[in-house]
């Protein structure tokens, strides 16, 4: 407990003499909450005083002389974030739909932005809905080129989760045709990639400051994960890759602290092609990622990154439930876990999130319902085990998007509750207008809550012909 002492000195002067009255009052005040005591730093401040010359009191009319000691408290810096146990629950339910183009009749600042590659990242107090825009809105006159992956107009934008990404709601963070973001507990880190295919550049922004860059190392479309990076104790880990979409593309991880790259991590193992990883914490020691191989296999490359040693290894998932699209029939690939099988050309980013429990861990995945097209989205789960060696099928856990609706990229993220983390999966539902009209997306969100079965799928409600 800290005593707060107030001393007051009052000096009274009269024409007949000097009357000195000294009053000292000491009182103890006790802080009611010990955590406040621990978090706040005391700082002493002393008021300036005037000197008093009493040699000739007859010349003094009236003087007040006081000295005050004041105790102030400085607000503490926010804490770095660490993964916690997941909030209780045994099933995912439909949480939210963000379908901007249901409001497509709006014009001007209320018009929805044309976007793709949405993802969500959360800090201790808020979640942000990110996307890559084509710097165009619907309705509007700039639809040409909105189906392109990379051009000079694309930007990383965000809105607070639950807001519609319109012109007036959106914050434009940086020029980018590939992106990521994460919160370390104190501040946001934003990642954007743009530039020519042969010499693209990663740019890092920490809060409002642009802080660092990273250059292409294979001169073939340097790109990042299109979902949230992951932070622990102030260190944030970002997956990047550089290489052919139909050949070798070796990934790396960047360790970033307060917006600056402090280490490069070069994974070992099955490294031929790894891109668009969806990553999360299996524990305080390990980040795991389910990734995309666009060249050789319909199995997902699975990364384990040790944050204590800053080492990473990649192997293919062994499950007979193949998670990429296009893909062969489940269980049809023979041989060891590292066998590629057929129908490995092409692919899609997949959703993946952890459910951390005291006695076990759940790994939740998403994949399209169609084996050949980006249609529908189903949820799967596997408790415990090792994705590198377990060949058993994943357990289906419900339909999030029916076969009649588009199911494109999907991603994982976690919402911070007061004492636990809520795992969620988001789904990009693309309005594919081809090259003749606008090309944009809605976002469906499913989160762990309660028990029972996943009850309802999501529709965008958008008719592009209107």
From Swiss-Prot:
InterPro entries named in the record: Glyco_hydro_34, Sialidase_Influenza_A/B, Sialidase_sf
Listed SUPFAM superfamilies: Sialidases (SSF50939)
Region of interest (Head of neuraminidase), ranges: 89-466
Cofactor requirements of the protein: Ca(2+)
Annotated disulfide bonds: 87-420, 122-127, 182-229, 231-236, 277-291, 279-289, 318-337, 424-447
Active-site positions on this chain: 149 (proton donor/acceptor), 409 (nucleophile)
Binding locations of substrate: 116, 150, 275-276, 292, 374
Region of interest called Hypervariable stalk region, as start-end residue ranges on this chain: 38-86
Membrane topology note: Single-pass type II membrane protein
Major localization listed first in the record, in broad terms: virion
GO cellular component terms attached to this protein's record: host cell plasma membrane; membrane; virion membrane
Gene Ontology biological-process entries: carbohydrate metabolic process; viral budding from plasma membrane
Segments for region (Involved in apical transport and lipid raft association): 13-35
Pfam families on file: Neur
Localization terms from the record: Virion membrane; Host apical cell membrane
Intravirion topology ranges: 1-11
Family named by the database record: Belongs to the glycosyl hydrolase 34 family.
Function: Catalyzes the removal of terminal sialic acid residues from viral and cellular glycoconjugates. Cleaves off the terminal sialic acids on the glycosylated HA during virus budding to facilitate virus release. Additionally helps virus spread through the circulation by further removing sialic acids from the cell surface. These cleavages prevent self-aggregation and ensure the efficient spread of the progeny virus from cell to cell. Otherwise, infection would be limited to one round of replication.
Binding partners and assembly: Homotetramer.
Protein name in UniProt: Neuraminidase
Source organism (scientific name): Influenza B virus (strain B/USSR/100/1983)
């Amino acid at each position: 407990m800290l005593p707060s002492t107030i001393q007051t000195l009052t000096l009274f002067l009269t024409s007949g003499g000097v009357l000195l009255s000294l009053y000292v009052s000491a009182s103890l005040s006790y802080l009611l909450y010990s955590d406040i005591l621990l978090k706040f730093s005391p700082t002493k401040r002393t008021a300036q005083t005037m000197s008093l010359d009493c040699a000739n009191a007859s010349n003094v009319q009236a003087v007040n002389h006081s000295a005050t000691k004041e105790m102030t408290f400085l607000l503490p810096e926010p804490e770095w974030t660490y993964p916690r146990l997941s909030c209780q629950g045994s099933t995912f339910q439909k949480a939210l739909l963000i379908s901007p183009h249901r409001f497509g009749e709006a014009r001007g600042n209320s018009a929805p932005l044309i976007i793709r590659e949405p993802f969500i990242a959360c800090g201790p107090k808020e979640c942000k809905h990110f996307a890559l825009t084509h710097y165009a809105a619907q309705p509007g006159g700039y639809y040409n080129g909105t189906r392109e992956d990379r051009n000079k107009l694309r930007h990383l934008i965000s809105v607070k989760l639950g807001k519609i990404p319109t012109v007036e709601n959106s914050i434009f963070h940086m020029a980018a045709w590939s992106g990521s973001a994460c919160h370390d507990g104190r501040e946001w880190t934003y990642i954007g990639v743009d530039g020519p295919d042969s010499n693209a550049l990663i740019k890092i922004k920490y809060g409002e400051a642009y802080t660092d860059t990273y250059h292409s190392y294979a001169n073939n479309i340097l790109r990042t994960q299109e979902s949230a990076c992951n932070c622990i104790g102030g260190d944030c880990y970002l997956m990047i890759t550089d290489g052919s979409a139909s050949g070798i593309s070796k990934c790396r991880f960047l360790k970033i602290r307060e917006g600056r790259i402090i280490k490069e991590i070069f994974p070992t193992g099955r490294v031929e092609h790894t891109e668009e990883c969806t990553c999360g914490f299996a524990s305080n020691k390990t980040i795991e990622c389910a990734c995309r191989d666009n060249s050789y296999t319909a199995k997902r490359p699975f990364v384990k990154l040790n944050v204590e040693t800053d080492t990473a290894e990649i192997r293919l998932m062994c499950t007979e439930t193949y998670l990429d699209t296009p893909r062969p029939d489940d269980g049809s690939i023979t041989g060891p876990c590292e066998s590629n099988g057929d129908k490995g050309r092409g692919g899609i980013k997949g959703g993946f999130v952890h459910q951390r429990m005291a006695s076990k861990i759940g790994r939740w995945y998403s994949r399209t319902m169609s084996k050949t097209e980006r249609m529908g989205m189903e949820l799967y789960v596997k408790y415990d085990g090792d994705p590198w060696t377990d060949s058993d099928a994943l357990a289906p856990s419900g339909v999030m998007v029916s076969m009649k609706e588009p199911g494109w990229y999907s991603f994982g993220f976690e919402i911070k509750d007061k004492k636990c983390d809520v795992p969620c999966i988001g789904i990009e539902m693309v309005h594919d207008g081809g090259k003749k009209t606008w090309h944009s997306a809605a976002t469906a969100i499913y989160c762990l809550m309660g028990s029972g079965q996943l009850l309802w799928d999501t529709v965008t409600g958008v008719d592009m012909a209107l």
